[in-house]
């Protein structure tokens, strides 16, 4: 059995990760750690775990003393809060999957620019592998530190990479318009996330400044083998979970829609969690799953190709992709513990 611990277990991504690992046939959950709910029972915070998990959450400060008891540590903390514990875990040969942003960007300078935090573990930036499972599987297999991708970058990168790998688009023309459920903003109390503030309304946020922008650009630059700068505009919509990413770009040459579909189906032919569909993606059809649904349209009037993708931001955009990466790291069947049919309604 894989002995696992989670720090940041009482956030939304941490809660979903706890649910997945608690049901994983190859995992024993050794501890759950929480800064805000230390020494409280996990099921007092999340009543869905009543009679399921009786553990008390340990405090974040106790995690270091428990590293000897685990093989892998999942960190689901705010930006800038992982440096000390991840450094210690790596030193003690504990594998780490970080669900936050601290190891996604390879440049400490870019991290400072977008997060306004001085990176304290620059060496680990070089060692960390970006955990976009379908794209970087071989590197993930041998890594001890995985930077789990963000939710918007997961949906957008999976949508766009086949176009880049096949040199189909003008890379200077990429625009990403994305919508997210409110859980993407996290569990911390915020006026903007109160029911009356976000219900019955939709709003853009982080326009021209969202922190996921350089992460998406870094991934697409790596895959295109050329520098990519793009426009990314996220929106908050009044639903609990889900992301719909709509990606626009100009075609380099005329191509038929069925040809593009063939390219996508070939690119993702061995990927059980990528569904190339004819109908337009909807977040309700991926809810509670590790699936990413992708559809394509071409607007011949404007020479634009539009790729749409839908994921569950707490699953493929966070917790279930982290479990997928753990499965890869340990040589398990990739679908183990996350082979879940989307829930509806």
UniProtKB/Swiss-Prot annotation:
Superkingdom: Bacteria
User: What Gene3D superfamilies does UniProt report for this protein, alphabetically?
Assistant: Dihydrodipicolinate Reductase, domain 2, NAD(P)-binding Rossmann-like Domain
Checking SUPFAM superfamilies in the record gives: Glyceraldehyde-3-phosphate dehydrogenase-like, C-terminal domain (SSF55347), NAD(P)-binding Rossmann-fold domains (SSF51735)
Biological or metabolic pathway of the protein = Amino-acid biosynthesis; L-arginine biosynthesis; N(2)-acetyl-L-ornithine from L-glutamate: step 3/4
Q: Where in the cell is it found?
A: Cytoplasm
Q: Which GO terms describe its biological process?
A: L-arginine biosynthetic process
Q: Which reaction does it catalyse?
A: N-acetyl-L-glutamate 5-semialdehyde + phosphate + NADP(+) = N-acetyl-L-glutamyl 5-phosphate + NADPH + H(+)
Q: Where do the coiled-coil regions begin and end?
A: none
Q: Which family is this protein grouped under?
A: Belongs to the NAGSA dehydrogenase family. Type 1 subfamily.
Q: What is the name listed in the Swiss-Prot or TrEMBL entry for this protein?
A: N-acetyl-gamma-glutamyl-phosphate reductase
Q: Which gene encodes it?
A: argC
């Amino acid at each position: 059995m894989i002995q696992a611990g989670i720090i940041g277990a009482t956030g939304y991504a941490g809660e979903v990760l706890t649910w997945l690992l608690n049901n994983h046939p190859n995992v024993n959950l050794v501890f759950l750690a929480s800064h805000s709910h230390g020494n409280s029972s996990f099921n007092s915070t999340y009543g869905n775990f009543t009679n399921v998990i009786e553990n008390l959450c340990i405090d974040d400060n106790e995690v270091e003393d428990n590293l000897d008891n685990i093989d892998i540590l999942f960190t689901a903390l705010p930006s800038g809060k992982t440096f000390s514990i991840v450094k210690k875990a790596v030193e003690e040969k504990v594998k780490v999957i970080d669900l936050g942003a601290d190891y996604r960007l390879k440049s400490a300078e870019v991290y400072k620019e977008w997060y306004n935090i001085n990176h304290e573990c620059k060496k680990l930036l070089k060692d960390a592998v970006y955990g976009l499972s379908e794209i970087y599987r071989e590197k993930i297999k041998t890594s001890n530190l995985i930077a789990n991708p963000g939710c918007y970058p997961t949906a957008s990168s999976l949508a766009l990479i086949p176009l880049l790998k096949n040199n189909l688009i003008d890379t200077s023309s990429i625009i990403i318009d994305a919508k997210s459920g409110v859980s993407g903003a996290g569990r911390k109390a915020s006026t903007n996330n109160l029911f009356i503030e976000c219900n019955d309304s939709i709003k853009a946020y982080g326009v021209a400044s969202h922190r996921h922008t350089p992460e998406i650009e870094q991934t697409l630059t790596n895959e295109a083998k050329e520098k990519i700068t793009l426009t990314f505009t996220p929106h908050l919509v009044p639903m609990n979970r889900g992301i719909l990413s709509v990606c626009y770009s100009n075609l380099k040459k005329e191509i038929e829609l069925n040809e593009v579909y063939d390219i996508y189906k070939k690119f993702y032919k061995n990927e059980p969690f990528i569904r190339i569909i004819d109908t337009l993606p909807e977040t309700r059809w991926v809810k509670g799953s590790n699936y990413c649904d992708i559809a394509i349209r071409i607007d011949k009037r404007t020479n634009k190709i539009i790729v749409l993708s839908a994921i569950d931001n707490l699953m493929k955009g966070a917790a279930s992709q982290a479990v997928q990466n753990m499965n890869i790291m340990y040589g398990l069947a990739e679908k183990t513990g996350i082979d879940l049919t989307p829930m509806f309604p």
